[in-house]
A protein has these predicted regions:
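Acidic/aromatic-lined carbohydrate-recognition and catalytic surfaces
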Residues: 1-159
Length: 159
């Protein structure tokens, strides 16, 4: 029987910010991960699952992505990422990226466009609701406390 690779692999998740700091700024980074690849391989790791490293205002620990095509500066550069990936492959390691596609940062280009008008082509990428009796559309709470809704004065709607 031919089993798929992820069914028999040792997968190690790395949260970059706290894994390994290569430049002494107190924040883990891609070069710190690269420096520890031999150690991870010796542990028997087959696959590295990397938490988000994309550009983000970091209001949600990097899960609020503002640019899916850029690396957050504190983690390094795209060149650092390419080098890390190349070094992983040299060691026979696979990489799984944590890709957040069900929401973006409010600083993402799509969201900023969606706020410009009610008929913007990006408007339907997000949930927009009219106020209910001058207040939030419902009582949904945010994971971090308070209301899940933010008011947009420009369009008189909540998102």
């Amino acid at each position: 029987m031919n089993k798929t690779w992820w069914k028999n692999s040792v997968i190690y998740q790395i949260y970059p910010r706290s894994f390994a700091d290569s430049n002494g700024d107190g924040i883990g980074d891609l070069n710190g991960i690269t420096a520890h690849l031999d150690y991870l391989k010796e542990l028997g790791v087959d696959v590295i699952w990397l938490s988000p490293v994309y550009q983000s205002p970091n209001d949600d620990n990097g899960y609020d992505i503002s640019d899916y095509q850029a690396i957050m500066k504190e983690f390094g550069t795209m060149e650092d990422f390419d080098r890390m990936l190349s070094e992983m492959h040299k060691r026979g390691l696979k990489l799984v990226m944590d890709l957040v596609v069900n929401h973006t940062s409010d600083e993402h280009h799509w969201f900023m466009e969606s706020k410009k008008s009610k008929d913007n082509p990006y408007r339907d990428y997000y949930i927009w609701k009219d106020p209910k009796d001058g207040k939030e559309p419902n009582n949904w709470g945010a994971c971090f406390g308070g209301s899940a809704w933010e008011y947009d004065q420009e369009t008189d709607m909540y998102y």
